[in-house]
Structures are given as structure tokens and as C-alpha cells.
């Protein structure tokens, strides 16, 4: 499995001496790696381009650590200074002064050996005690050792960054398929003038009409995701000359002064290096975000304020999704042009993927002659299955571990049973969708000797649990079915035996629950509840019609303004606790009570919080959260603002105006209590194609790496562990250590090094059990 480092420029420098210096107790240890044997810690991991002049980002591995803390005998050995704070100024006027530590033993200064447990914060001379800070903030532990005695002191590093523009700004250009920086908008503006900077440091006037559109207040972001695009309302202010972006947390403070990248000045991305530094300097506290605006008349307005949460972990895997309107394939005809008529241009229906560090998606299934859209993916990342556009009863599998090799899965029954099957995590089995459900191998051959499937069971939108021991589904057919409820059944692969079919949740009359997906713990299931049916595709997301008939208010021609083209399916994301069968709507994820109004929406139910569909859960938790990717037709700030149902290029021109049909990601607290809402406000998934309708994201882990392959964490490795190799670099291995680090293999929680610090064995990996 390849760790998904959405920020792109990742570098990992490993040294055996740094590993030795960094290892401490099982609850600590350095998160970054680097440095040499000449210093007592890791060489810096993240630089910001302002002080050190580049934007390299080192992802933070949890280094191998089998326990064994230093034995402190501090009565005779002391450190000076005690609990110091070092402040580093970066950006336009950088300033950094090393800090000299000294050790005293029985009243005399001695030559101690020095180490630091967090080398990403700086280095310390092993024999000199001279600490040189890097470019991240945080609290480290400095240890002095002399004649068998050790003593420690905390060291706080605070970073203050003041920037005028961004010295490492990306090329705005055309932005690629994913938009500028993978998030759209107008890119970064130039630095503010000296006069504007002086004015921006003044006292602003509050204006309640100035509000953040995106990101949302209290959004939880993972580390290493691409930086978000800040988007705000302007109220009555028509001419903004400059803006101050102020992002602060306990040990990192950033102020960026910018002129507009475009008119109107209504969005600005967070600089990449700043975003990385904020994420890796965070220690669990909320991040304060403020934007202050200077108008052309010299009046200062704001600040617009909110806060975010940074999860202490990176996201893992690849997201596979279908795109309707993609420019990466041209197999459908024809798109509407700017004049509202069919211009003969082809567009694509295809399955795409967002890979490590990308700002744009790549084509996986489909080409210029064949549409490939309806799909499912195995949680282990080995296999994708998708329906053929030329014959809906026929599907194809794609070997994601073998250059996406396509194999046709014939269906002589002609009933589309392989359109949306559940795929076992290892990619070897299919549990069929909708028709009389049965178990098949990945080539479409029925498995013999299967027992326990209820008579005439029709499992619609089925999904395996991450460990392959359960399947959840919409109860579409069979004894007691209603076509509306979520149910589950247990599965034992060794015997192909099914058992314990049970009903989990039935929505109110007239509503239907679809698209279940298990949380990594198997304790809960996320699904959507369709509250308004569009009248034409079950469990869909589309409008009520494409070409309105006279009875629908049109004449059968291309009239996108007609009511049935502007109204469609509504759905909300819920979760159910499997043990108690208590279901709860995820209001924080859905956006209840805080999403901005959708001004372009002409439907009768104009609430964006009811436009959320098709959730799937990343099988690997990270930072104490499960991560859900889902389809939404909500506004994306001021970038995607058209009617939510205008996403089909044949009936609406989306070649230059982004549709709102996009993929979003939300964090869910692990081990939440039944009946509570453990979700958090969602963020826009970076790198998806901006000028296309995107949906049905599958977040899966990448195929594991063999022993001897470089790694960052153990979940990338087939052997289950990521440990130092002969050259000091982290390598995949099957050799079992005395205890497993986070993301390494486990059988029980007792296998995990951090079991006393809340680390437990979840789906075979040591993982945090909840947010810190």
C-alpha cells in the first residue's frame, strides 16, 4: 500500500544514527526522519521556502520503537536552560538563533551526550549541545546523558512566518483538469505593497456580510492533503485591493499579505509550504483562520474568522471514481456549447483515479470508444469492476496490480448482476447486486458449495466489510424485504458459509436507504437515505429529466431551465451502530444548519444538506478517525455555483462553468457512541476533475509492497512491518518486532506498542481509537 501524500513533494531521508537517537518509549519517538550521526536527532523534515529556500516535505513516519525509556537520575545531572522556548522568524525577514544547552554534574559543567526526540523540530549536536531549529513548531524533549545518568527538559519551538506573497507560488496557468493546485480558483495573488501591508495591520471594521464559504468552520483535515482554497463572500464590497491571511496555532503563526489574483478577489489558496508546516506543527489544538480585506478606498474590513482541526495522520490509498463529462476520454456525444445548442463535441464517461501527490486525476477504465462508469473496487486495491457502456449486461474487471489489465466478465443472463457487486477485500469474490444474490469468483463463475444465503435474497448496493467477514446491503428482495432497509449478513470465506442475516435500519415511509459502507472497526455502517426520488433511477443522484416533455413544462428540446431538469434526487448520509441497531443522521457531514444558500437552485427543496449520496469509507483509519468519501451536489464555495443538477454535458454547458457534482471527504470519530453524530464538516476532495460531474468514489488501499521495498509505515508492506534496513532506511519486512507501531500488523491490541496510549488493533492494524 502506498501512503497517499496528497501534498505532492515528499522526500524521506533516513539515517540509522538518527533512528537510534530518536527511539524512546513506546508513546513517543520522532515522527520524522533525517539527519546524520553528527547530530542528536533528525535533520529537518519540512522547509517552507522562506528561510531554507525550498519546499520539500518529509512525511512523518512513526519510527520503529520497541519500548525502553531512559532511566532518569536527575538529582546530580542538570540541564541549562530549563524548559526554554526558541522563536524562529521565517518569510520576508528570516531570523534564527541557535540555542546552546549545557549540562552540570555535581556542580561542574560536563561534556554530556545530547539527543532530541523530535528531529523535525531541529538538530542538536551530540557532543556540543547546540540546538539548531528547523521550520516546524512544537515541543520536543532534550535529553542529556553523562556517566550513566540522564536528565531531560522540554524545548518549545515557535515559528513566526510573515510573507508578502508566496516565493514558491505554483504556476497558475490553466490549472490542469483538477484546477489550480488541484482545488480550482484563481491561484495565488502577488504580494501586497508596503502601503497595503501597513493598512492591513490596522484595526478592521466588522461586517456581518463577510463570511467564509469554504472551508467550513470546524472542518477536520488530515496531514499531507493538498492545501484548501479559502473562499469568502464580499457582501457589498465590490473592489478589494489586498488581503491578510492569518493562520495561527500554539506553536506556528503565519501572516500572508496578498494582492488579488483576479477580480473579484474572493478566493485565495493557502501556500503549500505554509499548509504543510501548519499541519505538522499542530499538536491537537484548533487552528485559527482569519481573512482581513482592504478595499480600494483604503477601508479595512473583517476579520472573517473560523477554526479547523488537524488530524495527526495522513490519508492512505487511492480514490477511484466515475466521471461523466471527463476530458480524459471522448466516447459520448454530444455536449452543449456556450450558445446552448448541441455543438457536436464529444465528452467522456469513464472511471478515474486520484493518485499520490496528484493535482489531476488519471484515466483507469474507458477510452475514446467505450464508456466505463458504474463500478466497484476491492478494499485491498487489487481489482476494479465496471459495467461496459456498449452492453450494460456485460462488465469488465481491471487488474490494478497488473497495468490495469482488462478481462471481460460475461453475463449470459443479461440482467446486469455484475453492475454494482460487492467485491471481497482481496479482489477474488463477487457478491451480486439486486438479482437473486449469489457468490461468484472474480471471473464471473458461480462458487459451488455456498450455504446460508436466504432464499430469493436480493441484495442491492452490497458492500463487504474491510476484513471480508460481513456484507451490508439494501434489502431489495427476499422474505421480509421492503426495498428500503439496510441489512447485513455474516460471511466465512474458508467455508463459503453465510449466516446471521439481520435487519439493521428501516427509514421512514417513502424513504430508502442505499450504498452501505462499513467503518474500519466493523462496528458501524455509513449509508445514504434517499428522501426524494427522482422518478427514474433508483439510488441515483440525477435530476427528474433531461429533455422535458410538454407535460413536464417543455417541448422535448434542450431547455435546462425547465423545472424537472432543475430538481432531482435528495439524500442524506447516516450511520448505524451494528450492535444496537441505532441509526443517526450525520448532520455535521451533511451540512445541517451551516451550508451557505444555493442561490442558483430553483428547486422546491433548496437545501444543500440534502444533496449527499453514495458514501464509502477508507478501510484504514488515520489520526483517530474514519474517513468517508461521498458524492455531493452542494456548492463548492464560489467556484462551483450552478444549479446542483446541471451536470450532464448533453443538457448543460459545463465546459467552462464547473458543475457542483463533486466528491467530498469527512472525518468520523472512531468508536462513537450509538445515537450520536460522530461526523465533522467535510472538505472538497482535491485533484478531481473540475469541469466534470464526479461521483461514486471508492477509497481503497494500494497493493502491498514486498519485503525489502522502501516504506513509510507498515500497512504498505505485505509482511506487515516497516523497519530500518541495513542502510538505516525504512524497509518492508515480515520479521515480527517485540511490538507493532501504529499502522503495523497486529492480531490483538496487546501486539501494539502504544496499547497504553489508546492504540488498538483495528482490522489487523495498530490504530488510534479516536481523536486526540
What are these regions (language model features)?
Residues 1-12:
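Bacterial N-terminal signal peptides that target proteins for export
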Residues 6, 15-87, 120-125, 129-132, ...:
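Ser/Thr-rich, Pro/Gly/Ala-heavy low-complexity intrinsically disordered linkers and tails
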Residues 64-104, 150-201:
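Short S/T/G/P-enriched beta-strand
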Residues 129-135, 272-276:
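Short, hydrophobic beta-strand segments
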Residues 137-148:
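A short beta-strand micro-motif common to beta-rich folds, especially ectodomain repeats
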Residues 162-710, 733-737, 767-772:
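Sequence signature of WD/YWTD-type beta-propeller architectures
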Residues 703-772:
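Secreted, cysteine-rich disulfide-bonded mini-domains of extracellular proteins
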Amino acid at each position: 500500500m502506498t501512503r497517499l501524500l496528497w501534498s505532492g513533494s515528499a522526500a524521506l531521508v533516513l539515517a540509522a544514527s538518527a533512528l537510534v537517537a530518536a527511539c524512546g518509549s513506546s508513546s513517543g519517538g520522532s515522527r520524522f526522519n533525517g539527519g546524520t550521526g553528527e547530530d542528536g536527532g533528525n535533520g529537518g523534515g519540512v522547509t517552507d521556502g522562506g528561510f531554507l529556500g525550498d519546499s520539500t516535505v518529509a512525511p512523518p513516519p512513526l519510527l520503529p520503537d520497541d519500548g525502553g525509556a531512559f532511566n532518569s537520575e536527575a538529582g546530580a545531572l542538570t540541564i541549562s536552560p530549563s524548559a526554554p522556548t526558541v522563536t524562529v522568524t521565517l518569510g520576508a525577514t528570516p531570523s534564527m538563533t541557535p540555542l546552546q544547552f549545557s549540562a552540570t554534574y555535581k556542580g561542574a559543567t560536563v561534556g554530556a551526550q545530547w539527543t532530541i526526540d523530535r528531529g523535525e523540530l531541529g538538530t542538536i549536536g551530540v557532543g556540543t549541545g547546540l540546538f539548531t531549529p528547523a521550520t516546524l513548531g512544537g515541543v520536543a524533549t532534550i535529553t542529556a546523558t553523562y556517566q550513566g545518568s540522564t536528565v531531560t527538559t522540554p524545548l518549545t519551538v515557535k515559528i513566526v512566518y510573515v510573507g508578502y506573497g508566496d516565493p514558491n507560488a505554483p504556476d497558475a496557468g490553466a490549472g490542469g483538469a483538477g484546477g489550480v493546485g488541484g482545488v480550482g480558483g484563481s491561484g495565488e495573488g502577488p504580494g501586497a505593497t508596503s502601503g497595503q501591508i501597513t493598512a492591513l495591520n490596522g484595526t478592521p471594521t466588522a461586517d456581518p456580510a463577510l463570511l467564509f464559504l469554504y472551508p467550513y468552520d470546524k472542518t477536520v483535515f488530515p496531514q499531507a492533503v493538498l492545501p484548501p482554497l479559502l473562499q469568502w463572500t464580499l457582501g457589498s464590497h465590490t473592489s478589494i485591493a489586498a488581503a491578510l491571511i492569518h493562520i495561527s496555532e500554539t506553536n506556528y503563526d503565519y501572516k500572508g499579505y496578498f494582492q488579488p489574483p483576479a477580480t473579484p478577489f474572493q478566493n485565495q489558496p493557502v501556500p503549500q509550504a505554509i499548509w504543510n508546516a501548519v499541519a505538522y506543527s499542530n499538536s491537537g489544538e484548533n487552528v485559527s483562520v482569519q481573512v482581513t480585506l482592504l478595499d480600494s478606498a483604503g477601508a479595512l474590513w473583517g476579520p472573517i474568522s473560523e477554526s479547523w482541526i488537524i488530524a495527526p495522520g495522513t490519508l492512505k490509498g487511492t480514490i477511484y471514481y466515475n466521471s461523466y463529462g471527463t476530458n480524459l476520454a471522448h466516447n459520448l456525444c454530444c455536449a452543449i456549447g456556450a450558445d446552448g445548442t448541441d455543438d457536436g463535441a464529444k465528452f467522456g464517461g469513464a472511471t478515474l483515479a486520484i493518485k499520490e501527490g496528484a493535482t489531476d486525476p488519471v484515466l483507469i477504465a474507458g477510452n475514446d470508444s467505450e464508456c466505463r462508469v458504474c463500478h466497484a473496487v476491492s478494499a485491498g486495491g487489487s481489482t476494479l469492476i465496471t459495467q461496459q457502456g456498449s452492453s450494460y449486461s456485460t462488465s469488465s474487471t481491471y487488474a490494478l496490480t497488473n497495468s490495469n489489465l482488462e478481462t471481460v466478465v460475461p453475463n449470459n443472463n443479461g440482467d446486469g448482476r455484475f453492475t454494482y457487486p460487492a467485491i471481497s477485500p482481496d479482489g477474488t469474490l463477487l457478491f451480486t447486486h439486486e438479482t437473486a444474490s449469489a457468490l461468484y469468483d472474480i471471473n464471473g463463475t458461480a462458487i459451488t458449495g455456498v450455504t446460508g444465503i436466504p432464499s430469493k435474497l436480493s441484495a442491492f448496493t452490497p458492500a463487504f466489510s474491510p476484513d471480508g467477514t460481513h456484507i451490508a446491503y439494501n434489502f431489495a428482495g427476499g422474505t421480509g424485504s421492503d426495498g428500503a432497509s439496510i441489512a447485513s449478513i455474516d460471511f466465512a470465506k474458508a467455508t463459503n458459509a453465510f449466516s446471521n442475516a439481520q435487519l439493521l435500519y428501516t427509514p421512514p415511509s417513502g424513504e430508502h436507504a442505499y450504498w452501505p459502507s462499513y467503518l474500519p472497526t466493523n462496528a458501524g455502517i455509513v449509508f445514504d437515505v434517499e428522501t426524494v426520488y427522482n422518478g427514474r433511477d433508483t439510488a441515483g443522484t440525477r435530476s427528474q429529466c433531461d429533455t422535458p416533455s410538454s407535460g413536464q413544462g417543455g417541448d422535448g428540446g434542450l431547455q435546462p431551465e425547465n423545472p424537472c431538469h432543475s430538481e432531482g434526487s435528495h439524500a442524506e448520509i447516516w450511520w448505524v451502530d451494528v450492535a444496537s441497531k441505532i441509526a443517526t443522521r450525520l448532520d455535521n457531514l451533511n451540512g445541517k444548519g451551516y451550508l451557505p444558500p444555493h442561490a442558483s437552485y430553483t428547486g422546491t427543496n433548496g437545501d444543500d444538506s440534502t444533496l449527499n449520496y453514495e458514501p464509502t469509507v477508507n478501510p484504514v483509519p488515520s489520526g483517530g478517525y474514519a474517513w468517508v468519501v461521498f458524492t455531493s451536489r452542494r456548492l463548492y464555495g464560489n467556484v462551483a455555483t450552478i444549479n446542483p443538477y446541471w451536470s450532464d454535458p448533453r443538457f448543460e454547458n459545463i465546459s467552462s462553468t464547473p458543475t457542483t457534482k463533486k466528491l467530498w471527504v469527512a472525518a468520523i470519530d472512531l468508536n462513537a457512541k450509538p445515537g450520536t453524530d460522530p461526523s465533522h464538516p467535510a472538505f472538497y476532495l482535491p485533484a478531481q476533475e473540475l469541469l466534470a460531474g464526479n461521483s461514486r468514489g471508492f477509497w481503497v488501499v494500494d497493493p502491498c509492497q514486498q519485503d525489502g521495498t522502501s516504506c513509510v509505515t507498515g500497512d504498505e508492506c505485505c509482511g506487515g512491518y516497516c523497519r530500518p534496513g541495513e542502510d538505516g532506511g525504512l524497509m518492508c519486512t515480515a520479521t515480527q518486532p517485540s511490538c507493532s507501531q501504529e499502522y503495523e500488523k497486529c492480531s490483538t491490541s496487546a501486539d501494539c506498542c502504544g496499547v497504553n496510549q489508546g492504540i488498538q488493533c483495528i482490522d489487523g492494524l495498530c490504530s488510534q481509537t479516536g481523536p486526540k
